[in-house]
Regions:
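Glycine-rich phosphate/pyrophosphate-binding beta-alpha loops
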Residues: 252, 268-280
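C-terminal helical "tail/cap" subdomain of flavin- and related membrane-associated enzymes
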Residues: 21, 291-372
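Conserved N-terminal helical subregion
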Residues: 48-163, 365-372
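Conserved N-terminal glycine-rich FAD pyrophosphate-binding loop of Rossmann-like flavoproteins
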Residues: 35-53
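Glycine-rich FAD pyrophosphate-binding loop
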Residues: 18-41
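FAD-binding beta-loop-beta segment adjacent to the flavin cofactor pocket
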Residues: 247-264
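Beta1/beta-strand and adjacent pyrophosphate-binding region of the FAD-binding site
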Residues: 1-11
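Conserved FAD/dinucleotide-binding core of flavoprotein oxidoreductases
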Residues: 86-89, 95, 171-250
Length: 372
């Protein structure tokens, strides 16, 4: 069995490890266009039980990654300078580069070495394999090389966002909402190591225009955001890493496979970053596909059909929650008219996954109006 995996992100690396671990004789090749240890962004966040989903199938990887994660049990919403703590809503985070390095270790343990700085240039390079896996992100070359075989659609949200880091290690995942003469802004921020946090700045299009970001370079934009969130940063600096303004792409595919090619992770679909499920979905994709391949082996069509049948209902449920969350953010300037506690209630119920009854069960102090 010859397998080509395009993309050495979490989905591609973890799938390669799982396939080679369970079938030592398979030829598994991983190619990645970027240099090794070159990654954009800062941290990745996992909601609820972090990487608990790994424990049953892969205790070794679970035990390797878990000590490197930062965890917390509460969530904080800051509005009008007032922090509102929501107890019982925990998250965990890890630096994206650190996660990739740990997955590279797992891959080395089964003698697979990804080929970095190897950009696929032609569809001809996808020939000669029993299975081709597109784990090469939103702008997947593998997916695009097949024309409309997957029924791909992409729409873009209106809000602008830019991904930064900061040297301030925040105590919890925090959503900080602020306003100035230009308009309204939000920062999603959480620590992903003992000394660093991820800091995502978001604003609506009208605010972006009034602030004049279109005419600013990366350094000027960083300076503006540091001034804007000076109180939140408390003297710490923000860090840029190709931190350009973007619109979030909602990518969907009507079909997850075509012939012997299958889509994984962000090449298959995107889930808005506000619910912290993108990396988890990608790694769960890898688990599900590896199980289907183990069951069906050389019946590639059967394996890919079984993979989609098992995963699509789960993915669509989470993507629906992500879409609902994203729509709340698209209208966050309107929500900011609410008082801090009412605003926090609106925020925590935005995805439709936490109704008042469940909130009273998991966050009794917040739901009961107690100060934490």
């Amino acid at each position: 069995m010859k397998i080509l995996i395009a993309g050495a992100g979490p989905a591609g690396l973890y799938l390669a490890y799982l396939l080679k671990r369970q079938m030592h004789g398979w030829d598994v090749r991983v190619v990645e266009q970027n240099p090794r240890d070159s990654t954009f962004g800062f941290g990745v966040v996992f909601s609820d039980r972090a990487i608990e989903f790994l424990r049953g199938d892969d205790a070794e990887t679970f035990d390797l990654i878990t000590p490197a994660m930062q965890t917390w049990t509460n969530l904080t919403v800051v509005h009008r300078g007032t922090p509102v703590v929501i107890d019982g809503v925990g998250f965990a985070a890890i630096g994206r580069l650190r996660l990739l390095q740990l997955l590279q270790q797992r891959l080395a343990s089964v003698s697979v070495r990804p080929e970095y700085e190897k950009a696929l240039q032609s569809g001809d390079e996808l020939q000669g394999y029993d299975l081709v896996v597109a784990a090469d992100g939103v702008n997947s070359f593998v997916r695009r090389s097949q024309g409309d075989a997957f029924g791909t659609t992409v729409t873009y949200l209106q809000n602008k966002f830019a991904w930064y880091g900061t040297t301030k290690p925040f105590g919890t995942l925090t959503q900080t909402f602020v306003a100035n003469a230009d308009g309204t802004f939000n920062a999603h921020h959480y620590r992903h190591s003992a000394r660093m946090s991820t800091f995502v700045v978001e604003c609506d299009p009208a605010t972006w225009d009034r602030a004049g970001f279109a005419a600013m370079d990366e350094a000027a934009t960083l300076a503006y955001c540091e001034r804007l969130f000076a109180e939140t940063l408390a003297g710490h600096r923000m860090v840029s890493n190709k931190s350009v303004w973007r619109n979030f792409p909602n990518l969907r595919n009507a079909r997850w496979s075509a012939g012997n090619t299958v889509l994984l992770g962000d090449a298959q679909r995107t889930a808005h970053f506000s619910i912290g499920s993108g990396t988890r979905l990608a790694m769960e994709d890898a688990i599900a596909l590896s199980k289907s391949m183990l069951e069906f082996k050389h019946d590639i069509g059967g394996a890919l059909a079984a993979f989609e049948a098992a995963r699509r209902p789960v993915v669509e449920k989470l993507v629906a929650a992500a879409d609902a969350s994203a729509q709340w953010y698209e209208r966050f300037p309107e929500h900011m008219r609410l008082a801090p506690r009412e605003f926090a209630w609106s925020y925590i119920q935005r995805s439709g996954r936490i109704d008042p009854e469940r909130l009273r069960r998991i966050a009794p102090k917040f739901a009961g109006g107690s100060e934490i």
